[in-house]
């Protein structure tokens, strides 16, 4: 586009209307491009006071401005000579411009807003300062596109920016676009290597013009499963033609096609170390803790759901949601909040261009927003997206080994549970077996078996299981999988059964012994009672006989016939004759012998009487015979009595 034509357009626009004034300060160049495309509604001068120093550009775009370069064919970039310097224009009076409302010059394809304001103001600077103004950044350093630093691309890019782009704007836009594409590719690589490769293919297709912006937008969202912010499509429409023109110019200098040049110099476009990439959370909508998409609050504040793919709906209201307001309390105090109608962080990380509203380091933002973008990753571990294929293979190998270890543990646990279940069934069968044996032993003891057979049968009961226990425990060979507690419990159960059987045996033996002792004691008591009864009966019979003899005073004590004589010693015993007296003397002398000493003491007594008879009877026992004179003298002493036993004692005994 010739410089004279640009001057004519600027003059005609300035004479048509005085809609707003533009300042020449550098913060205007920053704020114009860094505003969100979703907040690109046409605005007039701000009400309620003067606008901030770094927020001023609010005019519409000029016809045929560099912002509309996308309407030109991509294959034939315009080649124009550098415009001559305009010495007649002064820098003290800011020119005024009217919005572009005439459709005869061609439709304006970008929404009216800060994109056009920045580009138009850059064109004003170009018209006022001439072509001698070199593309510099705000701090005075030369502003060249990031990523192209060697070879003929550097000089060609610098010349392209000097000849066809606004000063301090075109190079910065190219740098922002490259950082944007680099951030997309790194975000895809953070998710997975496959998604990163797909995103890289989409980016190369977009730059090579094989994909339209809408197709790139839809396929990118389909590949990453994350919605992009509404400003992405207007940003690409505004800046992608600049990158394609630069690529075409560099390809012509290298005598190659754009596709060949991009294939050979792909690292210049997607070089992560050449520029600081944009935080992916600024390009993507936020997600909640469950990893699902969350509709932004700004799309539902007015009660209507708007499609993020249509920025014209979002341009009807100012954007008030700032990422600085989304910081959680755990991330520290938020940064100072810019005015609500600016979205300085929506397009790029341009913190080195701003002095009043400085943002944190991109690494800090990446670490803060990474749990929102990739919910599956750990917050304390930052994924290195510069891993090589070998490192990724190592990571996958480690993950595969981990999964194999987990599977082995699960398999071993399952086998252990199976073995434990089998052992539990075997223990249950064994306990049932012991219970049956114990019940059989109880039934046997309750039966009508004799007392002597009961200990024998009960003793044979526990001894049999004791011999069977080793045979029942021998078949178990899976001791490696059975814990010691199982065996210990089984042994305790067997020992408990043994102890109960032994206690029952001891109880049965003690009962038998007690009953035997009781039986012996009972028999002994019976014998003693029988003997005592016999003795008592004999003594009673003897006493009865004695009593009968004592009561019968007229019968002989020896033969029971009628007595005719009386013993001279006791005067109680009655005999029928001397023969019976001598026959009964063996028994009678025990009674009568005590009174024999009495007659011996009174032998000298001349008085005839019973002592004399006793004296005559007493000496007759030891001597064996009595004199007839003594017997004769004793006879008349007891008149009326039978003949004395003296003559009877003469009979040899």
UniProtKB/Swiss-Prot annotation:
GO terms for cellular component: Golgi membrane; nucleolus; nucleoplasm; nucleus. Residues 171-266 form the TAFH domain. Residues 394-412 are annotated as: Nervy homology region 2 (NHR2). Induction: Down-regulated by all-trans retinoic acid (ATRA). A zinc finger (MYND-type) spans 556-592. Residues 488-543 form a coiled coil. Residues 485-506 are annotated as: Mediates interaction with PRKAR2A. Residues 1-127 are annotated as: Required for nucleolar targeting (in isoform 1). Residues 1-435 are annotated as: Mediates localization to the nucleus. Zn(2+) 2 binds at residues 567, 570, 588, 592. The modification Phosphoserine is found at residues 457, 459, 637, 641. Residues 75-86, 331-341 have a biased composition (Pro residues). The record marks 127-128 as: Breakpoint for translocation to form type-2 RUNX1-CBFA2T3 fusion protein. Keywords: Chromosomal rearrangement, Coiled coil, Differentiation, Golgi apparatus, Membrane, Metal-binding, Nucleus, Phosphoprotein, Repressor, Transcription, Transcription regulation, Zinc, Zinc-finger. This is Protein CBFA2T3. The gene is CBFA2T3.
């Amino acid at each position: 586009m010739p410089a004279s034509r640009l001057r004519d357009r600027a003059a005609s626009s300035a004479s048509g209307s005085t809609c707003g004034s533009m300042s020449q300060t550098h913060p205007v160049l920053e704020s114009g491009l860094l505003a969100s495309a979703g907040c690109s509604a046409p605005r007039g001068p701000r009400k309620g006071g003067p606008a901030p120093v770094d927020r001023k550009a609010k005019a519409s775009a000029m016809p045929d401005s560099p912002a509309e370069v996308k309407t030109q064919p991509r294959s034939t970039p315009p080649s124009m000579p550098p415009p001559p310097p305009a010495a007649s224009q002064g820098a003290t009076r800011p020119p005024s411009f009217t919005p572009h409302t005439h459709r005869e010059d061609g439709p304006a394809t970008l929404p009216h807003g800060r994109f056009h304001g920045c580009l138009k103001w850059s064109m004003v600077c170009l018209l006022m300062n001439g072509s001698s103004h070199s593309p510099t950044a705000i701090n005075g350093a030369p502003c060249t596109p990031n990523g192209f630093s060697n070879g003929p691309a550097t000089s060609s890019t610098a010349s392209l920016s000097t000849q066809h782009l606004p000063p301090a704007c075109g190079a910065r836009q190219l740098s922002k676009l490259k950082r944007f594409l680099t951030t997309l590719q790194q975000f895809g690589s953070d998710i997975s290597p496959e998604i990163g490769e797909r995103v890289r293919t989409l980016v190369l297709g977009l730059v090579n013009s094989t994909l339209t912006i809408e197709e790139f937008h839809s396929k990118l969202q389909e590949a990453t499963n994350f919605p992009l912010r509404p400003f992405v499509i207007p940003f690409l429409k505004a800046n992608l033609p600049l990158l394609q023109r630069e690529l075409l110019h560099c390809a012509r200098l290298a005598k190659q096609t754009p596709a060949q040049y991009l294939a050979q110099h792909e690292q210049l476009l997607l070089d992560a170390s050449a520029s600081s990439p944009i935080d992916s959370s600024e390009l993507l909508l936020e997600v909640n803790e469950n990893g699902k998409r969350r509709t932004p609050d700004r799309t539902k504040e007015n009660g209507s759901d708007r499609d993020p793919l249509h920025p014209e709906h979002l341009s009807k209201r100012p954007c008030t949601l700032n990422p600085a307001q989304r910081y959680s309390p755990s991330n520290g105090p938020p940064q100072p909040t810019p005015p609500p109608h600016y979205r300085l962080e929506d397009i790029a990380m341009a913190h080195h261009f701003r002095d009043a509203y400085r943002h944190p380091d991109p690494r800090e933002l990446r670490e803060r927003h990474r749990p929102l973008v990739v919910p599956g990753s750990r917050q304390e571990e930052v994924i290195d997206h510069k891993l090589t294929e070998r490192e990724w293979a190592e990571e996958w190998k480690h993950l595969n080994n981990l999964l194999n270890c987990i599977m082995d543990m699960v398999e071993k646990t399952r086998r252990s549970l199976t073995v434990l279940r089998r052992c539990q069934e075997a223990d249950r069968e064994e306990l049932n077996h012991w219970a049956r044996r114990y019940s059989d032993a109880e039934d046997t003891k309750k039966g009508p078996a004799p007392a002597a057979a009961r200990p024998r049968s009960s003793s044979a009961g526990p001894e049999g299981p004791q011999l069977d226990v080793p045979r029942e425990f021998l078949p178990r060979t899976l001791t490696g999988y059975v814990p010691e507690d199982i065996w210990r419990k089984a042994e305790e159960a067997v020992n408990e059964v043994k102890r109960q059987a032994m206690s029952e045996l001891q109880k049965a033996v003690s009962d038998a012994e007690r009953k035997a002792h009781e039986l012996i004691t009972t028999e002994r008591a019976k014998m003693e009672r029988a003997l005592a009864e016999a003795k008592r009966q004999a003594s009673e019979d003897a006493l009865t006989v004695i009593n009968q003899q004592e009561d019968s005073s007229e019968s002989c004590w020896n033969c029971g016939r009628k007595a005719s004589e009386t013993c001279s010693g006791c005067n109680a015993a009655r005999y029928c004759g001397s023969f019976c007296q001598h026959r009964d003397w063996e028994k009678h002398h025990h009674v009568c012998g005590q009174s024999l000493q009495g007659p011996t003491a009174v032998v000298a007594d001349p008085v005839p009487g019973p002592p004399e008879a006793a004296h005559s009877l007493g000496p007759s026992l030891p001597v064996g015979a009595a004199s007839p004179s003594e017997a004769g003298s004793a006879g008349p002493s007891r008149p009326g009595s039978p003949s004395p036993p003296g003559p009877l004692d003469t009979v040899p005994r």
